A protein has these predicted regions:
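N-terminal helical capping/dimerization or prosegment-like subdomains
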Residues: 1-93, 319, 323, 336
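An extended, acidic, His-containing surface patch that forms the Zn2+-binding/catalytic region
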Residues: 74, 183, 241-319, 331-340, ...
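Active-site metal-coordination/substrate-binding segment of hydrolases
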Residues: 76-147, 438
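A common structural junction motif
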Residues: 86, 233-237, 342-352
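A generic structural motif
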Residues: 116, 207-209, 325-334, 363
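Histidine/acidic-residue-rich, glycine-tolerant segments that coordinate divalent metal ions
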Residues: 140-221
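A short core secondary-structure module
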Residues: 216-238
C-alpha cells in the first residue's frame, strides 16, 4: 500500500466522507426515500471516479442497490465487497451533542449517524481500493462492489436481485466490513452472526377507549394486557418462554468457548462504558459471551397506546402495539421461530383480547467456517498494519444478507474497524479517525496479499 496515501490525501478524504455522512439516508422512514437515492448516487459517482467500467443502479420494490465492477485484471482473484449506505433513525435527537448529519470531529473521533454503521466502513473499503489501484500499473485484485440501502429496515431488494442473478455472487472471497474490533487494539474476525425476527404485536381489548372513572375496575386495559403478555413471554431471569427455542440451539464448540475465555474482559468497564448501566440482566448461569453471542434474545423496542400527550386524559386504552424482536442463533431458522412465537403468544393471550402478530422483517443466523486460506491472509494484513492478528469471535448483531453472500461458494470474511464504544444505533455514533486510516491500510494490504503481491 502507498504508505503516504492517507497523509497526502487526508483533507480530500475527510471532505468526501463528510459529504457522504451529511446525507440523511434513513431507510426505514418514507420521508427519507429521496435521501437514500442521493446516497446511492453518491456511491455511483465514487465508483465511476475509481475507474469502474460497469456501474449500475439496480431498482426494485424499495431503495436501490449500487453495483460496480473494477477494470478486469486477467488472472487476478476476485473479491466481492458488501456494505450498506442506509442508516438508523436518530431518535432521541436531543441526546446528540452535535447534529447527526453534520459530521463533527472532537478529540480524534468523528461523530455522525452512519460514521461506523456503515458509511464510514464502506468509505474505508473504497479508499483502500483507491490506494492500491495503480500500484505496479494495475490493481492487484478484481473487485465487485455491492452496496444496498435496506440493511437497517429489512427490505427485499438485494435478496430479490441475488436470487434472480446469483452469478453476481461469484468471487474468490466476500469481504464485509460492517463489524468491529473485539476491543481497542484487538482486531477481530467473526465466526457467527445472529439472525433476526422482528414483529409488531397488536392487541385490542374493547371497541373504543373508555372512561376510567365509569369503567375502571371492570374494563380490560390494552396497555396492561400487552405488558402482561410480554412479561409472560420473557421471564424476569431473561428466559424466553417460546416453545422448543433453546432445545434447537446449536451450542458453541469447546474450542470456541476456550477461545472466548482467553479474551480480555473487564466487567466493570463493560458496564460503565458500553452498557452505561449499573448491572446486567439475563440468564445468570450463562457467561456474558454466551448471552450476547450464542443464545437467543427477546427484546421490547417500543409500546404505543392510550394517551401520551402533555397533561392528563383519564382513559382506559382499547388498543396497544408493541414492537418486539428475537435475535436468532445457529439452529434457529426465521420460519421456525415465527411459528413458535405464534404459538407462544396464543399461550399467553387472555380470552378477552384480540391480537395479531405482524412480522416486519428478519433473517437467518449465520455460522462461518474460518479455515479457508483467505482468513489467514486477512490475519496477516491486520498483523502487518496494526501489529496484532485477529481473534475469532461471534457477533450479537445481524446482517440479513449475510446468509446469502456465501451461497456462491466464496468464504465470507466478516470484520471491521469499529470499537465497542462507537455507539451503533445510538445518539453520538462515532468512528475513531485513526481506526479509519488504519482500516484503509489494512484492507489495501489485504487486497495486495490476496492478489499475490506480498
Amino acid at each position: 500500500v502507498d504508505s503516504q496515501f492517507v497523509t497526502r490525501e487526508k483533507d480530500r478524504l475527510l471532505a468526501e466522507l463528510f459529504e457522504f455522512l451529511s446525507i440523511p439516508s434513513i431507510s426505514t422512514l418514507p420521508d427519507h426515500a429521496a435521501d437514500c437515492r442521493r446516497a446511492a448516487d453518491w456511491l455511483m459517482n465514487q465508483l465511476t471516479v475509481l475507474g469502474c467500467p460497469r456501474v449500475e443502479l439496480l431498482e426494485g420494490n424499495g431503495h436501490p442497490v449500487v453495483w460496480g465492477e473494477s477494470p478486469e485484471v486477467a488472472g487476478a482473484p476476485t473479491i466481492l465487497i458488501y456494505g450498506h449506505y442506509d442508516v438508523q433513525p436518530v431518535d432521541p435527537i436531543d441526546e446528540w451533542v452535535s447534529p447527526p448529519f453534520t459530521p463533527t470531529i472532537r478529540d480524534g473521533k468523528l461523530y455522525a449517524r452512519g460514521a461506523i454503521d456503515d458509511k464510514g466502513q464502506v468509505f474505508t473499503l473504497l479508499k483502500a481500493y483507491e490506494a492500491v489501484r495503480d500500484a505496479d500499473g494495475r490493481p492487484p485484485v478484481n473487485v465487485r462492489f455491492l452496496f444496498e440501502g435496506e440493511e437497517e429496515c429489512g427490505g427485499d431488494v438485494v435478496f430479490d436481485l441475488l436470487a434472480a442473478q446469483p452469478e453476481r455472487l461469484r468471487a474468490d472471497a466476500v469481504l464485509v466490513a460492517d463489524m468491529g474490533y473485539y476491543a481497542e487494539g484487538w482486531p477481530a474476525v467473526y465466526t457467527a452472526l445472529r439472525g433476526m425476527c422482528y414483529a409488531e404485536l397488536h392487541v385490542r381489548t374493547s371497541e373504543r377507549d373508555l372512561h376510567s372513572g365509569h369503567y375502571g375496575g371492570v374494563a380490560p386495559n390494552a396497555i396492561e394486557t400487552i405488558c402482561r403478555m410480554l412479561t409472560d413471554l420473557k421471564g424476569r431471569d431473561g428466559t424466553i418462554n417460546v416453545p422448543n427455542l433453546y432445545e434447537s440451539v446449536i451450542p458453541p464448540s469447546d474450542t470456541e468457548r476456550a477461545g472466548w475465555e482467553s479474551l480480555p474482559f473487564d466487567r466493570e468497564k463493560f458496564l460503565r462504558e458500553e452498557l452505561t448501566a449499573k448491572s446486567m440482566t439475563g440468564i445468570e448461569s450463562a457467561s456474558v459471551f454466551e448471552r450476547t453471542w450464542a443464545l437467543p434474545t427477546f427484546e421490547f423496542h417500543g409500546i404505543r397506546g392510550g394517551f401520551t400527550g402533555e397533561g392528563a386524559k383519564t382513559v382506559i386504552p382499547a388498543s396497544a402495539v408493541a414492537k418486539i424482536s428475537l435475535r436468532l442463533v445457529p439452529g434457529l431458522s426465521l420460519e421456525f421461530v415465527k411459528q413458535q412465537l405464534q404459538l407462544a403468544v396464543e399461550n399467553v393471550a387472555p380470552d378477552y383480547a384480540q391480537w395479531e402478530l405482524r412480522f416486519l422483517h428478519g433473517g437467518d443466523p449465520v455460522l462461518i467456517d474460518v479455515d479457508h486460506p483467505a482468513f489467514a491472509v486477512l490475519d496477516r494484513a491486520f498483523e502487518e498494519v496494526v501489529g496484532r492478528r485477529t481473534v475469532a469471535v461471534r457477533a450479537g448483531g445481524s446482517i440479513p444478507i449475510a446468509s446469502v453472500l456465501g451461497t456462491g461458494g466464496a468464504p465470507v470474511l466478516l470484520t471491521g474497524i469499529g470499537l465497542p464504544d462507537d455507539g451503533l444505533h445510538s445518539p453520538n455514533e462515532k468512528v475513531t479517525v485513526q481506526q479509519m486510516w488504519d482500516g484503509i491500510r489494512v484492507f489495501g494490504t489485504f487486497f495486495e496479499m490476496f492478489g499475490g503481491r506480498d
